[in-house]
């Protein structure tokens, strides 16, 4: 998977027990931000389907995204999808608790990276402030202030 952060990853199955029944195995990267983004973008939906919380035909393995605007700019790695932890901010750039305040007022959602260094895989302390994961496509080398991007709000 060509993304930042998030590698290496794996998925497969292994025979378990006397019956040899296949048990799914999902391998996550080792760095904290890589695990965080990989789990939210790929694994959470799969677990929801496997546990019966969501029917497979509803496509729950793909998280739902909203459109938000970047309050500030940041660089994105060339040729890789960037998954960047974000917080929602108000018009002045101050952190807001969640996107619902914007939805209730009918305004636009604005976001900013939770850490000034962006989505580096070792920035674990910043994850406590994350309220969403931004999805920057591989052809975008820099996000500019005001640019629209897909954002996956985090639940819980």
Model-based region annotation:
Residues 1-156:
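Flexible glycine/proline-rich
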